[in-house]
């Protein structure tokens, strides 16, 4: 039976390659224990897994049930008050809200780990996992890192998210793509699945048929071509150039890859190394079979130079004529020169520089790396450099950090989790609930996690050389070991810390030292770009980077480190909250920063009053952030046309049942799109309530708030939990992400604010 282990309990004493800055605080690993669990517990797990499979085409998002089953067993709670139901013709009472909050808080307390954070599914893009599996297979480490139990769960996950036509999307909710289908099919085959010996032979047959019917693997985007070439089922002559020499260009040139958004930069870095080394797995039976199964014509007859230019039209951003010309020149003329003497000498210099950067990234993230794609690629590079190196062994010890198990199977997370982010938001929600008897223990433990996760080290060496900004004082998305400060994570953590400082030290402990808060302000201010926005990772990149190196060909390319209302709003809120408590510290700089950020938010507002989301779905999420950012800057509803228009937008989207529910297709449609059947979603309803409550909606017309509160009260389950209703997170604007804690956090937050604003209850002991 699978069990989630956290913190130091995740460390195998026989593994000497793991390192940590704070004794693995926040680390979370799913481990298989054949002796664990009673027969009844195993039966319950199997029933949940079977239930998901039976309903997988109707409900594609897992509910993180396995975590809940384990933690509810380990962290027993007091008997819950009876569930509340408010009929359509009845008004919401204070007791209704208080009881619902108490039930929600008691349930949520069971999900908190011993070290103070909240764990949860943070998966999304399905193409992350194939890259890691291919990397492990090529290095010969697949079976040593992933046990048969891991591989069985990975296969179950992939099969569960296959669409009825045989394809796979880029994420569980997405329509079928050649990229997703080819990589998922290859992953299953590498794990021993075949049409002759698998219980899922029909699923494999349908997948292969879909691939062939859609042009075969020659039509996958460049990223897919790259991974297939590494595996040895595609030729490098069919891959667009990824010249490592570009890293030797003067940094002042716009074509320097150091100007790429952070995530793309740290993916292009190892890709260019592997491209230059032409890594390709040797021919095996499975490689030979895949060469036959993935293409519409015999492998030896494929025109690879022609294939290099191919790509499914619906899956890529079309390249411009200029881009095509540059890539052709690089492929036909520059690459032959760099592959032979004397150009080879320059290539060797570039490769040495790249490995310096890779080792720096590995060492400053404890071999976790900024994302799972760069993790797999960096691991390959270390293996290529020295197959017996300590660096490669340290990489292998960190693979399991990215894997998460739910009732739909084992998947790869967007990061090594979202522990800090979820915990910071949870603190703010718990404080808003104003029920200290229910919250004080949770808050005390969460505070310790947040404090101990703050980055307390500066990046070693010259920041400009390593393409970094200052790190000391920032907060990461997940764990301190991950090491990357993120603007909105830092801002939300600071707001949580400042909110905790207003609570009784008897309840939550001593406040964070001023010096560390000041260090956080240094980091936050460094994120601001010249246009007033705050980037997620790096403020130094221009708005127009070197598009020629957009190796993903993804339509979400620009959103990864460019204009973002959510990050900008979070930082403005944090700076404003800090300024109220510490009005003398860098006051002028903070004032100017807030003004510039506010102007950016106002410029970004859409004509209908909304804002477009980047990290959540979509207009609902971003409009809440837009409003909160403007309010933090000092704007008020009756004085701000922007806030008035935003509130009008939100109210115009309220459903007849009183809730809100937005489909992730809003990203693609570029217009607000309701969920099918005009269903309400508790998280979207909560975001809308929080936005309206912050602007004083209760004083203008409280009826929309009462109707929304009924949705949140009536949607609560017998356990105090809320059901999984659909995806809520996003990345790049075109890939969905799961945030399993949101369905608990935001109803608590919204009902807490509703209770305070409508019934005037604050800091109650009950």
Swiss-Prot record:
Matching PROSITE patterns: TERPENE_SYNTHASES
Organism superkingdom: Eukaryota
Q: CDD domains attached here?
A: SQCY_1 (cd02892)
Per the record, the pathway is:
Secondary metabolite biosynthesis; terpenoid biosynthesis
Q: Which UniProt keywords apply?
A: Isomerase, Repeat
Catalytic activities? pre-alpha-onocerin = alpha-onocerin
Q: Where is this site: Transition state stabilizer?
A: 421, 615
MF GO annotations: intramolecular transferase activity
Question: Which InterPro entries does the annotation name?
Answer: SQ_cyclase_C, SQ_cyclase_N, Squalene_cyclase, Terpene_synthase_CS, Terpenoid_cyclase/PrenylTrfase
Q: Does the keyword field hold Signal?
A: no
> Can you say where the PFTB repeats lie in this chain?
101-143, 151-192, 456-507, 517-558, 594-634, 643-684, 705-752
**Role:** Oxidosqualene cyclase involved in the biosynthesis of alpha-onocerin, a triterpenoid characterized by a symmetrical structure due to cyclizations at both termini of dioxidosqualene that inhibits acetylcholinesterase. Catalyzes the second half of the cyclization, exclusively from pre-alpha-onocerin.
Protein name (record): Alpha-onocerin synthase LCD
Q: What organism, scientifically named, is this protein from?
A: Lycopodium clavatum
- Name of the encoding gene: LCD
């Amino acid at each position: 039976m699978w069990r989630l282990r956290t913190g130091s309990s995740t460390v195998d004493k026989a593994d000497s390659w793991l390192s940590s800055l704070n004794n693995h605080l926040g680390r979370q690993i799913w481990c298989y224990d054949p002796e664990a669990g009673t027969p009844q517990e195993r039966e319950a797990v199997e029933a949940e897994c079977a239930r998901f499979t039976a309903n997988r085409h109707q409900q594609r998002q897992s509910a993180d049930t396995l975590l809940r089953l384990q933690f509810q067993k380990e962290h027993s709670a007091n008997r819950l008050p009876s569930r509340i139901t408010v009929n359509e013709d009845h008004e919401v009472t204070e007791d209704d809200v208080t009881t619902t909050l108490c039930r929600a808080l008691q349930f949520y307390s069971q999900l908190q780990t011993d070290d103070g954070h909240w764990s949860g599914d943070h998966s999304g893009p399905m193409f992350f996992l194939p890259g890691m599996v291919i990397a492990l297979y090529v290095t010969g480490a697949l079976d040593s890192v992933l046990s048969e139990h891991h591989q069985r769960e990975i296969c179950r996950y992939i099969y569960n998210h296959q669409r009825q036509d045989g394809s796979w999307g880029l994420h569980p909710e997405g329509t079928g793509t050649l990229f997703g289908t080819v990589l998922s099919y290859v992953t299953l085959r590498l794990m021993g699945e075949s049409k002759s010996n698998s219980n899922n032979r029909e699923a494999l047959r349908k997948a292969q048929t879909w691939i062939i019917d859609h042009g075969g693997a020659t039509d996958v985007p460049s990223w897919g071509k790259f991974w297939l070439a590494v595996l040895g089922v595609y030729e490098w002559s069919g891959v667009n150039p990824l010249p490592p020499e570009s890293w030797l260009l003067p940094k002042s040139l716009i074509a320097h890859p150091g100007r790429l958004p952070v995530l793309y930069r740290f993916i292009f870095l190892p890709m260019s190394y592997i491209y230059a080394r032409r890594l390709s797995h040797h021919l095996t039976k499975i490689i030979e079979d895949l060469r036959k199964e993935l293409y519409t014509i015999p492998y030896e007859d494929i025109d690879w130079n022609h294939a290099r230019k191919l790509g499914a039209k619906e899956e890529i951003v079309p390249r411009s004529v200029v881009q095509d010309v540059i890539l052709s020149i690089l492929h036909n003329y520059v690459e032959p020169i760099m592959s032979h003497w004397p150009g080879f000498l320059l290539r060797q210099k570039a490769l040495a520089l790249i490995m310096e950067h890779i080792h720096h990234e590995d060492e400053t993230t404890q071999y976790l790396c900024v994302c799972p794609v760069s993790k797999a690629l960096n691991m390959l590079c270390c293996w290529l450099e020295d197959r017996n190196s300590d660096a490669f062994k340290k990489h292998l010890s960190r693979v399991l950090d990215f894997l998460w198990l739910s009732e739909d199977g084992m998947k790869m997370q967007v990061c090594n989790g979202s522990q800090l982010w979820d915990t910071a938001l949870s603190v703010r929600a718990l404080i808003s609930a104003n029920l200290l008897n229910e919250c004080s223990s949770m808050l005390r433990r969460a505070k310790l996690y947040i404090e101990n996760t703050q980055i307390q080290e500066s990046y070693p060496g010259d920041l400009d050389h390593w393409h970094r900004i200052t790190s000391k004082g920032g907060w990461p998305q997940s764990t301190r070991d991950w090491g990357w400060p993120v603007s909105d994570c830092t801002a939300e953590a600071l707001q949580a810390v400042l909110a905790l400082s207003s609570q009784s030290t008897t309840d939550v402990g001593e406040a964070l030292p001023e010096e560390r808060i000041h260090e956080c302000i240094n980091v936050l201010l460094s994120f601001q770009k010249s246009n007033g926005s705050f980037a997620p990772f790096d403020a130094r990149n221009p708005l127009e980077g070197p598009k020629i190196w957009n190796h993903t060909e993804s339509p979400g390319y620009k959103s990864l480190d460019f204009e973002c209302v959510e990050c900008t709003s979070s930082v403005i809120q944090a700076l404003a909250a800090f300024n109220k408590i510490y009005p003398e510290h860098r006051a002028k700089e903070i004032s100017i920063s807030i003004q510039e950020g506010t102007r950016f938010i106002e410029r970004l507002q859409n004509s209908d009053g909304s804002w477009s989301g980047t990290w959540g779905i979509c207009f609902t999420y971003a409009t809440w952030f837009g409003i909160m950012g403007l309010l933090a800057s000092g704007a008020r509803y009756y004085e701000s046309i922007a806030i008035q228009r935003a509130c009008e937008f939100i109210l115009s989207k309220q459903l007849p049942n009183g809730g809100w529910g937005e489909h992730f297709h809003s990203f693609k449609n570029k217009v607000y799109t309701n969920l099918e059947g005009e269903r309400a979603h508790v998280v979207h309803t909560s975001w809308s309530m929080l936005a309206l409550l912050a602007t004083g909606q209760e004083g203008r017309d409280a009826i929309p708030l009462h109707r929304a509160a009924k949705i949140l009260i009536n949607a609560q389950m017998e356990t105090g939990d809320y059901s999984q209703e659909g995806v809520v997170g996003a990345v790049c604007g075109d890939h969905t992400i799961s945030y399993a804690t949101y369905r608990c956090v935001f109803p608590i937050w919204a009902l807490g604010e509703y209770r305070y604003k409508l019934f005037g209850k604050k800091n109650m002991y009950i």
